[in-house]
Amino acid sequence: MFYSIVAIFVGAGLGALLRWFLSLALNAFFPAVPLGTLASNLIGGYVIGVAAVVFTVRVGLPPEWRLFVITGFLGGLTTFSTYSVEVMTHALEGEFGWALAVAALHLTGSFALTALGMWTARAWLAAA
């Protein structure tokens, strides 16, 4: 149990730090669509696709690795709450086109990158 807690704790901290760094580095470029939040969610979508396949196929991996990557790191990296407030801020300011665009970018992008991550992992594992 102790190692599980540590794995989640460390993973979440690293994921949250990466999200913060991405926001610092990217959000100023295009304020209408905060690119740091988008990058965090898209990267998270890709990584969870890879992780879902790897942890399903490589059943011998210690369970703490799954907790570190999926529960911790990706839980800290991805952010539904920030995405929600960004979409609703546009909507409440009457910018319905931007609200819809931001929502669509996050949802379709994340699904597409999750599928790409799963495909990547399957191809990588098949070649190994």
UniProtKB/Swiss-Prot annotation:
Q: Which Pfam families match?
A: CRCB
TM region positions: 5-25, 35-55, 67-87, 96-116
Q: Can the keyword Metal-binding be found in this entry's annotation?
A: yes
Q: Which GO terms describe its cellular component?
A: plasma membrane
Molecular function GO labels: fluoride channel activity; metal ion binding
The source's domain of life comes to Bacteria
InterPro entries given for it?
FluC (IPR003691)
Could you tell me what this protein is called? Fluoride-specific ion channel FluC
| Annotated organism of origin | Burkholderia cenocepacia (strain HI2424)
Write the gene name. fluC
